Structure formats: structure tokens, C-alpha cells
């Protein structure tokens, strides 16, 4: 049964035929207006037009350029030079009008692409445009239609449509609605639609409140904000996710863009992390249940195993774009051994090299796939970890894999190799190369923004490394354990430093982009008495006055130019190059590099102290910049020393890792004759008074004496007594071999 409705429009009558619901839908129709004087010539009748119109009819006033029907948002554009819609192949359909009605032309369109970047596929609708009004007659978008996708920015008409919708529904004032432009554009810049993902409503609203606070905007309430979101991202659904008693409402079908600054916020971990089942319900060491460690410490949502696996894969793929997965493991050197341990052969040496190479490649693959928790199992398998009675009764190592390794290299021979010093050194060098590759994979650029969820996962991974390795090597000789733990400790420390540096870089980036803060920093810096700073620091650092003055001038100039973070990084790199250039190619280069770090830190602390005493308004910004520059200087010096010594940065940092073994030897190596001669030359060239020079020489003798190892047969003795609130008195001129301090008493042995 069919019904008819009549629409009155500026004296014209248009009869609209509607059909019952359930008839087959036809493609969306776009209507173009035809001048009145051509009405009679262009009138054509098509009998099938009665099947075009579904049961829903909506009227829009002529002044309204936008209208809605269900989930469809369609916009009419006033542009004349460009074509609004791209027409695909299809037949033409014409509307039947009354005798005095204005004639319109109907063009079939299967996909509509607007200039604003919104692509829509809809079914069963028609647009009729006339001088008095615009009418949309058609079905709402159902599952049979095409999906809606958004590009980076929406057209102005899309934003106007959302604002007008809110004005009608909530009665917003014109002043308040003018603020919605920035809110809507912020949503489009930071969020995008995607299938199979969700965001907590509270988290998204908290991001919005932070945005309003940073830009000093008046936020709308949560209900109006929800309408804002739905007016921009059409087709969003709401789901209640989480465990019983801890569930929250989520927007399903929306996510944060990968390049959005919101990825660096700490609270993004609540939705960037994979949703997984509670840890106590999982089977230990099941690979796909807990892949990347990102979800450590997060409650699950009770999803099924297939859903968890899909979420894990999607999350892993999202984070892998921030890694450098193309880096391969470098080739290891051959083992150089003079004599084989008893009961071993050269074939066993080759088996050890092959097995350890495969072991390191497996670790690299696990890290590339962000399966951090599996590294513990790899260590346990290689080192034949076999607890007598596991606490949870699970089998930690696979019997098949363990039997294969045991057949290639029995554990008894592995123990013998671990006691050989040549094998220990070879394995340490392999570890340094592997860990350096892992660092470059996880953090290829310390200044590039990294999602906070990935950063936290890396830090949790670094925190667990030493414990995992020590537990897996419980039955291995202590010498090998110390060497391996020292290497993995340097690796963990490097990960912690680089993630902290990255976090500081992103925080400082916002400061360096703020013009008002930069101007305030420059004004406060010009009030600092650098002459007084140099006078106080020169006695400690003994730096060239001209070099310090040049650094001050360059720093102010770079700050005044409002340089970017990358430009500041290039400036700091140039400072390191100029400071260490006199020591290039000399054995004292590592010592000079560390001394430069100390001097840089001392000077910067003096400047910060002056700013503090003056109650500088930009003290917080300077403090943040100082932390970043000190950390980045450490990073640069670390790589310069590694380049000068021909080692990896991990090897440089691991040089002093084993305190029980490395302290005397490394100190003796570091305090070589070249460095001591340089110190003597500096003392001879100085123009200090005799009393001051005598005090310096006494202090130097005391420090050098404390660092010399007590390896000789006879131990020379001297006594340094420190009475309460009295000065130190040296009672003998003999060399102080070893010093130990307890309270205020120093005893020389």
C-alpha cells in the first residue's frame, strides 16, 4: 500500500510518492536544480520513481545548508568552480513533478566524495533541492552501506554542521558555539575511526579537559562533549567493557592517531595497552596470551581468547612502527682459545658458537616482536635451568628443545666452558654487540616521540632483566654470572636512560615551541651575573674564560632564535666536538670526556642557582631544559668515547659494571701515566699561590693514594686521625694504600 504526501514550497506543490519499507533500495540520488524557464522542456516521466522513496521523509528549511537523516550527514556546498561529487558509472533517474513544480534532475551516485575529505557510501536515498528548501528522502545507513572514513581534517561545512546541531539541541549561545570550532578540530587532529578498537569515555574526556586547560578554553560538560564526538565521528557505538565491578563505558570504533601528541601522555596506557585476562587465569609462558609486556599490571576485560589475540596483534603492529626492525645482529668473532678444557674438543667449541648465535638471534626476534616476557624462557632454556619443584607446577622449558640443545652441547661441557677465561671474554663481547643492536631497535632515535605505553613497557622490561638472568644462571659458575650480569645491567641502564631522555625531550619540545616562555627565559638569563658564575666555577673547573664566554653567547643566541629541539641537539653536538677536539686520538680521551661532563654539569648548576636566588619566573623551564641538556650531553659523550675506543656504547658503559672485579683494575687503567702527566703539567703551568698549590698537591696525593691497589707484599701504614670538629692531620708522609671511612674517622692501612 502506498501513501502520498504533499510539500508546499514557495507556491509550488511537489507530490512525493513513498513506498512501504522493505522494498529494494536503489543507489543514492543527487539532485541538481534546473532554472525555471527550462521546466517544460526538461520534464520527463519515469514510472519506476515510485520505488525510490522509502517510508521516511524529512523537511529542512531553505536557509539550512545541512541536514541529517539517521546516521547520514550530507552537506550542500556553495562552490561553483569545483565539482562537489564524483560520479561513478550508473543510470540516470528523473523525478516526476507536478504541473507547477520546479523541475530537478536526479543523478545516480554510488559514492560521494566531498571536498572536505569525507567519503561516504549510502544506500536508498535521494536529495531534492529547490529554491525554497532542500529535502533528503532516503534510508539511514545500514550494514549494507559502505563504511565511513575520515581524513586528517574535515571541511568547514562539517564543523558548521556539528555546531548547528548542538545549537539546536542544547541551545548554545553564539559566543560559546564559536569556541566549538577549536574543540572539533582538536578531535579531528587527534582521533580517527578504526575497526576493532575502543577508548574509555572518561579517558577521552580527560584528554579534552587537559587540552582546554593548556589553551585556556572553557570546556563543555561531559554530555555535550559526547554529542561533539558523535557529531564528528559518525557511527560510534558505546560498550561497557571491563571485569565485573570495574567496567567502564567505551567508545567503540575510535582511536588516537599514531602521530598524535596524546600518545605521549601517561594515561594513554589505559587504552593503548592490550586488554587481557587476569594474570592468575593464564598459563605461564604461553606466548600469545602476553606478548609485549605492555599490558603488565593492567586489568583485563574478560574478552575471549580470539579477541585477546587479535588485540595483541593489532597493538604489537601499532608499536612496531616506532622500532627499527631492519637492524640485523652483527657477526660474532671466533673464539680464540689457547688450550681446551679437559674433556672438550674443537667440535664442542663450534657447537657453543652455533648455539649461542642462535640464542642471540632468538632474543632479537623476541624483542622485535615485543615479546619481552619470553626472554626469560630463552635464558632458562640455554642455561639448562631446571628447578627441582616449580612453585606453580608448570614446565618452564620444553623437553624437545632442551633435549636437542643437550645433544649438541651437554651441560657438563657448558659448565667447563664457563670456567674458561677466553670463553667468558668472547661471550661478553657477543653480549655487548647483541645488546647494542637491541637498544638501536627499541629506541632508534632518542628525540623521536614514543608512545608512553611502549616507553613504560621498555622500562618494565629493563627492570626485570637482571633478575631473570640471575635466576636462569643459578647453576652456572660465578665468574660467568658476574660477566653476564654486568653486560645485561649496562643494557638495562641504557634503556632506562634513553627512555628518560626521550621523555624529557618531548616535555622540553613544548617549552621550546612556546614563544612567551622563550622570551621570559631570555629576559631571566640576561639578568644572570655570568662573570660571578665564571669566577666561582673557574677554581673548580679551570676552563678557558674565552670558551665559557663563547658558550654563553651562543646559548643566548640560539635561545633568541627560538630554535627547535633538533637544532638544540645539533648545537650541543657541536659543543662536545669543540670541547673534546684537543684530546682526539689520545689515550686520555675517555678521561677528558668524563671531566667535560662534570664541568658542564657544574656550570649549569651554578646558573640554575643564580636563577633560583633571583626567583626567576622561568625557573621551571630552565630546570627542565637543564635536565634534558645534561642527559643529552651524557648520550653524546658516551657515543664519542665508544667511537674513540672502537667499542660499542654498551661496552663503554659496561666497563665499570662489575664493581667487584673492575674497580682496582679499571681505576689503575684510567689513571694512567698520560693523565697523571697532564695533571702535573696543569699544576706546573698554573699561577696559583704556593699555599694554594701545596693544598692542591696534598689533596691530589690523598685521592691518588686511595685509588692505588694494595697488591704488594708489605703494606705501608700511616694514620689520619679526625677528631670531632677538628681538621684532618696527616701524621706520616708514606703513601696511603687503602682508605676506609666510618663516620668521621679515616683509617689508612
Curated annotation (Swiss-Prot):
GO biological process: cell differentiation; cilium-dependent cell motility; DNA-templated transcription; endocrine pancreas development; epithelial cilium movement involved in determination of left/right asymmetry; regulation of DNA-templated transcription; regulation of insulin secretion
Coiled-coil regions listed in the entry: none
DNA-binding region: 183-258
Primary subcellular site in the record, as a coarse category: nucleus
Gene Ontology CC terms: extracellular region; nucleus
Subcellular location: Nucleus
Biological role stated in the UniProt entry: Transcription factor required for ciliogenesis and islet cell differentiation during endocrine pancreas development.
Family membership: Belongs to the RFX family.
Protein name in the entry: Transcription factor RFX3
UniProt source species: Xenopus tropicalis
The organism's taxonomic lineage, starting at the top: Eukaryota, Metazoa, Chordata, Craniata, Vertebrata
Gene: rfx3
Amino acid at each position: 500500500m502506498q501513501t502520498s504526501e504533499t510539500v508546499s514550497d514557495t507556491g509550488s506543490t511537489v507530490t512525493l510518492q513513498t513506498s512501504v519499507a522493505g522494498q529494494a533500495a536503489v543507489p543514492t540520488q543527487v539532485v541538481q536544480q534546473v532554472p525555471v524557464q527550462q521546466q517544460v522542456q526538461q520534464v520527463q516521466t519515469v514510472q519506476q520513481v515510485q520505488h525510490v522513496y522509502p517510508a521516511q521523509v524529512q523537511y529542512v528549511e531553505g536557509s539550512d545548508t545541512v541536514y541529517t537523516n539517521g546516521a547520514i550527514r550530507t552537506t550542500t556546498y556553495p562552490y561553483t568552480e569545483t565539482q562537489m561529487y564524483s560520479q561513478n558509472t550508473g543510470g540516470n533517474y528523473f523525478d516526476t513533478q507536478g504541473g507547477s513544480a520546479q523541475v530537478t534532475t536526479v543523478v545516480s551516485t554510488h559514492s560521494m566524495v566531498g571536498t572536505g575529505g569525507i567519503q561516504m557510501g549510502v544506500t536508498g536515498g535521494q536529495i531534492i533541492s529547490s529554491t525554497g528548501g532542500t529535502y533528503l528522502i532516503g534510508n539511514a545507513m545500514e550494514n549494507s552501506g559502505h563504511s565511513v572514513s575520515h581524513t586528517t581534517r574535515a571541511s568547514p561545512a562539517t564543523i558548521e554542521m556539528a555546531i548547528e546541531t548542538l545549537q539546536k539541541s542544547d541551545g548554545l549561545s553564539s559566543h560559546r558555539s564559536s569556541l566549538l570550532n577549536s574543540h572539533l578540530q582538536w578531535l579531528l587532529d587527534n582521533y580517527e575511526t578504526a575497526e576493532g578498537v575502543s577508548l574509555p569515555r572518561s579517558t577521552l574526556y580527560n584528554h579534552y579537559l587537559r587540552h582546554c586547560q593548556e589553551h585556556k578554553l572553557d570546556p563543555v560538560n561531559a554530555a555535550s562533549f559526547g554529542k561533539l564526538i558523535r557529531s564528528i565521528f559518525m557511527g560510534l557505538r558505546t560498550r561497557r567493557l571491563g571485569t565485573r565491578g570495574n567496567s567502564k563505558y567505551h567508545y567503540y570504533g575510535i582511536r588516537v592517531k599514531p602521530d598524535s601528541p596524546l600518545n605521549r601522555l601517561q594515561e594513554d596506557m589505559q587504552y593503548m595497552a592490550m586488554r587481557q585476562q587476569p594474570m592468575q587465569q593464564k598459563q605461564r609462558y604461553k606466548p600469545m596470551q602476553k606478548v609485549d609486556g605492555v599490558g603488565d599490571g593492567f586489568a583485563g576485560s574478560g574478552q575471549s581468547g580470539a579477541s585477546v589475540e587479535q588485540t595483541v596483534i593489532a597493538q604489537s603492529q601499532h608499536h612496531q612502527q616506532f622500532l627499527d626492525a631492519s637492524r640485523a645482529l652483527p657477526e660474532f668473532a671466533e673464539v680464540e682459545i689457547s688450550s681446551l678444557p679437559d674433556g672438550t674438543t674443537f667440535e664442542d667449541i663450534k657447537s657453543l658458537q652455533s648455539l649461542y648465535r642462535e640464542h642471540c638471534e632468538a632474543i632479537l626476534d623476541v624483542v622485535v616482536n615485543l615479546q619481552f616476557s619470553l626472554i626469560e624462557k630463552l635464558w632458562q632454556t640455554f642455561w639448562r635451568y631446571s628447578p627441582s619443584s616449580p612453585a606453580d607446577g608448570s614446565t618452564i622449558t620444553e623437553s624437545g628443545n632442551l633435549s636437542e640443545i643437550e645433544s649438541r652441547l651437554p651441560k657438563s661441557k657448558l659448565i667447563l666452558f664457563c670456567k674458561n677465561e677466553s670463553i667468558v671474554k668472547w661471550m661478553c663481547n657477543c653480549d655487548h654487540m647483541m645488546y647494542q643492536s637491541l637498544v638501536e631497535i627499541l629506541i632508534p632515535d632518542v628525540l623521536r616521540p614514543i608512545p608512553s605505553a611502549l616507553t613504560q613497557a621498555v622500562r618494565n622490561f629493563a627492570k626485570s632483566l637482571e633478575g631473570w638472568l640471575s635466576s636462569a644462571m643459578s647453576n652456572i659458575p660465578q665468574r660467568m654470572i658476574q660477566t653476564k650480569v654486568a653486560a645485561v645491567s649496562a643494557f638495562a641502564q641504557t634503556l632506562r636512560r634513553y627512555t628518560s631522555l626521550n621523555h624529557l625531550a618531548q616535555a622540553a619540545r613544548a617549552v621550546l615551541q612556546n614563544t612567551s616562555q622563550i622570551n621570559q627565559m631570555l629576559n631571566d638569563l640576561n639578568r644572570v651575573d655570568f662573570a660571578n658564575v665564571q669566577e666561582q666555577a673557574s677554581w673548580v673547573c679551570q676552563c678557558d674564560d674565552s670558551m665559557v664566554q663563547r658558550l654563553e653567547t651562543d646559548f643566548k643566541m640560539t635561545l633568541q632564535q627560538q630554535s627547535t629541539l633538533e637544532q638544540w641537539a645539533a648545537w650541543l653536538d657541536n659543543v662536545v666536538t669543540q670541547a673534546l677536539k684537543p684530546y682526539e686520538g689520545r689515550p686520555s680521551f675517555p678521561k677528558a670526556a668524563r671531566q667535560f661532563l662534570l664541568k658542564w654539569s657544574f656550570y649549569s648548576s651554578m646558573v640554575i642557582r643564580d636563577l633560583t636566588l633571583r626567583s626567576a619566573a622561568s625557573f621551571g623551564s630552565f630546570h627542565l631544559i637543564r635536565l634534558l641538556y645534561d642527559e643529552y650531553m651524557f648520550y653524546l659523550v658516551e657515543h664519542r668515547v665508544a667511537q674513540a675506543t672502537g667499542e660499542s656504547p654498551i661496552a663503554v658503559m659496561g666497563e665499570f659494571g662489575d664493581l667487584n672485579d673492575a674497580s682496582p683494575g679499571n681505576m689503575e687503567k684510567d689513571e694512567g701515566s698520560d693523565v697523571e702527566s697532564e695533571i702535573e703539567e696543569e699544576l706546573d703551568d698554573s699561577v696559583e699561590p704556593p699555599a694554594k698549590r701545596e693544598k692542591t698537591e696534598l689533596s691530589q696525593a690523598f685521592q691518588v693514594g686511595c685509588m692505588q691497589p694494595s697488591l704488594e707484599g708489605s703494606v705501608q701504614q700511616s694514620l689520619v686521625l679526625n677528631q670531632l670538629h677538628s681538621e684532618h692531620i696527616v701524621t706520616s708522609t708514606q703513601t696511603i694504600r687503602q682508605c676506609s671511612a666510618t663516620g668521621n674517622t679515616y683509617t689508612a692501612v
